[in-house]
Curated annotation (Swiss-Prot):
Residues spanning the signal sequence: none
Name of one Pfam family that matches: Trm112p
Annotated PANTHER family: PROTEIN PREY, MITOCHONDRIAL, ZGC:162634
Membership in a protein family: Belongs to the UPF0434 family.
Protein name (database record): UPF0434 protein NMCC_0628
Lineage of origin: Bacteria, Pseudomonadati, Pseudomonadota, Betaproteobacteria, Neisseriales
Taxonomic source organism: Neisseria meningitidis serogroup C (strain 053442)
InterPro entries linked: Trm112-like (IPR005651)
A GO cellular component annotation in the UniProt record: cytosol
SUPFAM superfamilies: Trm112p-like (SSF158997)
């Protein structure tokens, strides 16, 4: 994921900053506690496509 896209994209729930996790191919919203998947280079920024982040993941 290119930095220029990360500068533009925000969490659709909180409108907050997202973190790119290359190893999991996800964009994380710590504020919403959601991880949005990236499939074939395309971020799926729908709340119903996201998975809930676990407490252990949020500590990292």
């Amino acid at each position: 994921m290119e930095k220029k896209f990360l500068d533009i994209l925000v969490c659709p729930v909180t409108k907050g900053r997202l973190e790119y996790h290359q190893d999991k191919q996800e964009l994380w919203s710590r504020q919403a506690k959601l991880a949005y998947p990236i499939k074939d280079g395309i971020p799926y920024m729908l709340e119903n496509e996201a998975r809930a982040l676990g407490e252990e993941e949020l500590k990292v």
